[in-house]
Amino acid sequence: LPLATMMVNPKPASAAAATKSSITPDAALTQWKASVVAIDTLLDRWDSLAGGDAIRKELGTANFGTETSPLFQIQKAFKVLRDNDDSISDLVEFTEQSEEFTNALNRADTMAYSANFAGGSGKPTPPKVYTDKAKIEVQDMKRIAKSISSLLVTSP
């Protein structure tokens, strides 16, 4: 009988509570607004960044040093905003746009990561090819971010 109970409820109540997000809706909204600024700053500084890891640091996908990009774990902020009915004017559209944003972020990260290993033996591809592709994805993130921001309700 104890084994059956374990199979039905494998997590104790305290573990289930610990998995809930500790981010408040206000903190999630603040993180989102900072992320929009980070995207603009990244695009403005693009030509001065030194390689794929510098791009990935700004994307929040490779955290080097003491500062963390607001884009780091942005999916958690999206979840908090989705779960807070008062934050979004159109839940379905927000969900679709936030997934599209996350996909573009992942593609940008992949291209920036690939730039770190480009230029090997054989017929090498220059790293700039991959950083240029990453930039296209970040520009797409900016476009999607405008759409997401328009769906957020910022005043009561």
What are the language-model segments listed below?
Residues 13-16, 79, 112:
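Small-side-chain structural scaffolding
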Residues 2-22:
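N-terminal twin-arginine translocation
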Residues 27-90, 94-100, 104-105:
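Alpha-helical segments in soluble extracytoplasmic regions
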Residues 25-46, 104-156:
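C-terminal amphipathic alpha-helix
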Residues 5-12, 42, 56, 141:
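Domain-wide signal for the mature, well-folded portions of proteins, strongly enriched
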Residues 1, 49-50, 118:
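Intrinsically disordered, low-complexity segments enriched in small/polar residues
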